[in-house]
Structure formats: structure tokens, C-alpha cells
Amino acid sequence: EVKNLLKFLKYRERVKRFKKLESLCSDPKSEKAQSYLMFRYQILIEYVGTDFRGWQVQTKGKTIQGLIQERISKLLKEKIILFGAGRLDKGVHALEQSAHFECKKKIENLSKFVKSLNHFLNKEMISIIKIKKRGNDFHARFSARMRIYKYKIINRPSRPVIDKNRGWHIINKLDLKIMKKAAKKLVGTKDFSTFRA
């Protein structure tokens, strides 16, 4: 929690500095102002995480963040860093993961940019659903109001084909009555920190 607070304070300080810079530059179109100006964009991402080592960039292995960062950097011809709303683990899929990046050059045609990006990413089972220009007060992680996680159990003897790698296959019949009773114990404010990997 302290780590998250420090990140947030750092981010808030950055926003303050940007606003100060904005006020120092009386003409936002001047060369001085343009050299400080960064354009921020939010993207919504859908992906199948089966062949990835999760969201976050790692030294070894293919990650969602790493691949998208690399493709955006190539298209814009500048190094960018992608910030995600959350860090999903290995093999986890996403329907609408929010992320943002900053770049020096304004993207003139957003739909063309997404089309070019998806040309490469779709082969990797990643799709950019939407892109939107955002203000500097937006942050994919700290501006997120909610996160929804879905866990799928496929309870039958035969192996799933369509839902392969998209759910937990359990052969033995589950006792839903006991499961519902146990689920009630999870409702409310709880500390599940001991269950972390």
C-alpha cells in the first residue's frame, strides 16, 4: 500500500509540474511550449493471454505490455512506456483492459493508427478496441473506478474445446449448495494477503 501511495504522489507531482509549465508558456504553440508538451492517449485492449507471461514487461518471455509498447514505439518512431490499469498474470485474458501512453507527436488520425497497430497485434491474439486522447490528469491505474474479474469453471466429464484455456475444467460433480454457502463467507471486507503468490 505504501508503494502505491508513493507512486500516486509521484504522479500527482508530475501533473502539478505540467500545469506550472503550461502557465509559464504563454503561447502553447511556441517552440518552447511544444518541446515540453506530451500527448496522452488511453487505449482499451482485448487479448488472449494463453501464450504470454502476463501483462508486465519481463526480462525473459513475451508479455502483453512489452509487445504493445514495442509496436506503438515503432509506429510513432519514439520510445513510449505503456501504463496498465492492472497487472494480469500469466495465461489471463482481458476483454477491456485500460492502458495509457504519452508521446511527443500528436496522432492525427486515431482510427488509422489503431488499424495499423492491430495489423501487427491481431496475429498475436491482441486487439486494440478503442483509442482516446486524454488530459494529463488521467492515469490508467489511478483513474480506474472499478475492475471486474470473471472466473469460469467448466464442470463436465468431457474436455472443453471452444473454452480450452479459458476456464478451469473440473470432471467431478460440484456441490453447488455447499459452494454457495461457503461463498457467503467471502462477502465483506477481508484480508486475503496470505493467499498472494
Which residues are covered by each model-predicted region?
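Short hydrophobic targeting helices and cationic amphipathic motifs
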Residues: 5, 9-12, 24, 28, ...
